[in-house]
Amino acid sequence: MLKVAINGFGRIGRNVLRAVYESGKHQQIKVVAVNELAQPEAMAHLLQYDTSHGRFGKRISHDQEHLYVHHDACPQGKGEFDSIRILHLSEINLLPWRDLEVDLVLDCTGVFGCQADGLEHIKAGAKKVLFSHPGASDLDNTIIYGVNHETLKAEHNVVSNGSCTTNCIVPIIKVLDEAFGIESGTITTIHSSMNDQQVIDAYHSDLRRTRAASQSIIPVDTKLHKGIERIFPKFSNKFEAISVRVPTVNVTAMDLSVTINTNVKVNDVNQTIVNASQCTLRGIVDYTEAPLVSIDFNHDPHSAIVDGSQTRVSNGHLVKMLVWCDNEWGFANRMLDTALAMQAAK
């Protein structure tokens, strides 16, 4: 049993805890603690009720020091439940990971992300750390599960899980490059609103993000091309990306255009994705030609879902694809896959 602690109980932290149970991985992963500055009542409420993902199928209760995940519908104090320690500490070095025998910290704060931060968790008693965002270049490894998780080694103690968008697009790039050879590419990320945007116009260091999230399509900076280069150094200076935020609360679409070496038709491209989704990337990549819209991919655990009805090929070598992902739920599920891969690494 892998004992994990979740540091930061925001969108990703709460989804990670839900995914432990909804994916069935609670047989392999035990969450022993959550560190979050918010009050226990709010933590329990937002875990139980979620605007994007609906009501959690497990009943949640709490006291001032614990969250309780009940295995059945019995009243509080009866039936089986899992007890999760609640902590409210802002300094990593004060966290009681040693006393709690924590094997792995899932750091979902979005604040910490360099090797030194990870080592602070380890000094506090954790054995390993997995960050929920790209992190600094000095980490032991950055993993896009399904693409390079087999590069994990036992000595890789401070690891990044990449970003939701790299987890979405990198598996597709891998498939296309192995099948046809990629020369270069561009990506437009069409991303749902995030909590770094404003409900109504208000001050922000990024002037575009001073504007109300629900009223505009808002361009934002992205380092997605750098994330691709980190996984595939061969594509240094070969990809560029832009990103816009749109007034939806969840699910992201990625418009991928690549120039390839091989002369192909639409069916060649789509069949390659289908084959990967049924074999090497099963559970990571999915494929559909149904006439779906963004809400239909909400709570989908795959990293990427290719809409084959939108694949286009120009002059045999320019390929355009539409790739969907639930930027919260898919990423949370990959956090758990990577956590187990870190545990198993030799």
Curated annotation (Swiss-Prot):
Recorded catalytic activity of this chain's protein: D-erythrose 4-phosphate + NAD(+) + H2O = 4-phospho-D-erythronate + NADH + 2 H(+)
Binding, substrate: 163-165, 209, 222-223, 245
Record-linked InterPro entries: E4P_DH_bac, GlycerAld/Erythrose_P_DH, GlycerAld_3-P_DH_cat, GlycerAld_3-P_DH_NAD(P)-bd, NAD(P)-bd_dom_sf
Coiled-coil portions: none
GO molecular function terms listed in the Swiss-Prot or TrEMBL record: erythrose-4-phosphate dehydrogenase activity; NAD binding
Any one Gene Ontology cellular component term annotated for this protein: cytoplasm
Keyword NAD applies: yes
Site entry: Activates thiol group during catalysis: 191
Entry-linked Pfam families: Gp_dh_C, Gp_dh_N
Function: Catalyzes the NAD-dependent conversion of D-erythrose 4-phosphate to 4-phosphoerythronate.
PANTHER family in UniProt: GLYCERALDEHYDE-3-PHOSPHATE DEHYDROGENASE 2
Family the entry assigns: Belongs to the glyceraldehyde-3-phosphate dehydrogenase family. Epd subfamily.
Name of the molecule in the record: D-erythrose-4-phosphate dehydrogenase
Lineage: Bacteria, Pseudomonadati, Pseudomonadota, Gammaproteobacteria, Vibrionales
